[in-house]
């Protein structure tokens, strides 16, 4: 159990290290603390905090910096979210001000806005609704024996993929396939469509001699529509906080942000974090799955748009980020994104 004075010292070290980015010594603390304490007493208290693992010493300085344990304790017990002023809220609202035709456009834009506001890497996850339905199906001729297979979901999202037509299929057969899919599958939930599609294979074979290829393409588009879709803004902002002397870390981070499998997006999920702070989750350093991110923290929040599902927003930045400000900002941004999505769905559902 930390004493009141030790709590003040820990909080001041974290705040000053966030502002200055340099180890904090006893003289600096003596000037910053709201209570009068001798430099010797401060050094003794710092020794206690260091022994308990809340702060650590850098070899090149006599000052101290927060440890991951120190940050964790601070976020769980000491942080007070900054209230975002009305001018900043209006600024966020104006950045969201465009009209959108697809929900994915809103989610993609939110990642860019959040990244621009923080100068960190932002990750946004599209709402995932268990009762999403297949709203429409089309095949658009592209020429050279190819068509674009297009699925429209009930939330307005659109997925598509190119399909190479068999040599012997004609326009009449193609129209028959479109009618069959619309008659038998449109209106079903996306989770049901997968199994129903297999049941349709004997009928599809009447019009497409080798229907396996079509079913594979259709199934691939369904998978994209069902799985969690995320967007990343400011990928390269990660490099701003890398250790400039550690060439291997920089190379590995480059690999991480350019990874086609989007490992960054995989950091965000819809599970509850044991360190939730009034609906805001904070993961610090080794609490994330990737060892490359030991010097980073993830601040995330879930948003809920009722029957249209739940999604998530997050920022990935340095462990010495200003947590009070970032938690307050993420909280406000989550509310504004939710409002924007509710407005979108209200218009779409009419």
From Swiss-Prot:
GO molecular function, one term: DNA binding
Coiled-coil residues: none
BP GO terms, sorted: negative regulation of DNA-templated transcription
Key words of the record: Repressor, Stress response, Transcription, Transcription regulation
Gene3D superfamilies listed in its UniProt record: 3.30.450.40, Heat-inducible transcription repressor hrca homolog, domain 3, Winged helix-like DNA-binding domain superfamily/Winged helix DNA-binding domain
One of the Pfam families matching this protein, by short name: HrcA
Domain of life according to the entry: Bacteria
NCBIfam families attached to this UniProt entry: hrcA
Role this protein plays: Negative regulator of class I heat shock genes (grpE-dnaK-dnaJ and groELS operons). Prevents heat-shock induction of these operons.
Similarity annotation: Belongs to the HrcA family.
Protein's name according to its UniProt entry: Heat-inducible transcription repressor HrcA
Organism: Ligilactobacillus salivarius (strain UCC118) (Lactobacillus salivarius)
């Amino acid at each position: 159990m930390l004493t009141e004075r030790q709590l003040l010292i820990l909080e001041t070290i974290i705040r000053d290290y966030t502002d200055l980015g340099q180890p904090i010594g006893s003289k600096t603390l003596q000037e910053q603390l709201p209570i009068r304490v001798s430099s010797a007493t401060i050094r003794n208290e710092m020794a206690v905090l260091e022994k308990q693992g809340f702060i650590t010493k850098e070899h090149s300085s006599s000052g101290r910096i927060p440890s991951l344990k120190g940050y964790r304790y601070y976020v769980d017990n000491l942080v007070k979210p900054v209230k975002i002023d009305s001018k900043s809220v209006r600024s966020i609202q104006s950045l969201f001000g465009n009209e959108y035709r697809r929900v994915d456009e809103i989610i993609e834009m939110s990642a860019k806005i959040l990244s621009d506001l923080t100068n960190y890497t932002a990750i946004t996850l599209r709402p995932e609704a268990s009762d999403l339905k297949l709203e429409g199906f089309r095949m658009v001729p592209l020429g050279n024996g190819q068509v674009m297979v297009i699925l429209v979901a009930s939330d307005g999202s659109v997925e598509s993929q190119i399909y190479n037509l068999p040599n012997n299929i004609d326009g009449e057969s193609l129209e028959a396939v479109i009618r069959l899919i619309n008659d038998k599958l449109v209106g079903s939930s996306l989770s049901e469509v997968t199994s129903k599609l297999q049941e349709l294979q004997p009928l599809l074979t009447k019009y497409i001699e080798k229907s396996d290829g079509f079913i594979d393409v259709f199934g691939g588009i369904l998978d994209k529509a069902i799985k969690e879709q995320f967007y990343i803004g400011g990928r390269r902002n990660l490099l701003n906080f890398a250790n400039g002397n550690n060439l291997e870390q920089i190379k590995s981070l480059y690999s991480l942000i350019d990874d086609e499998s989007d490992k960054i997006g995989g950091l965000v999920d819809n599970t509850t974090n044991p360190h939730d702070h009034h609906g805001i989750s904070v993961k610090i350093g080794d609490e994330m799955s990737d060892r490359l991110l030991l010097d980073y923290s993830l601040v995330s929040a879930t948003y809920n748009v009722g029957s249209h599902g739940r999604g998530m927003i997050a920022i990935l930045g340095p462990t010495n980020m200003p947590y009070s400000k970032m938690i307050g900002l993420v909280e406000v941004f989550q509310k504004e994104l939710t409002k924007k999505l509710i407005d979108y769905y209200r218009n779409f559902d009419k």
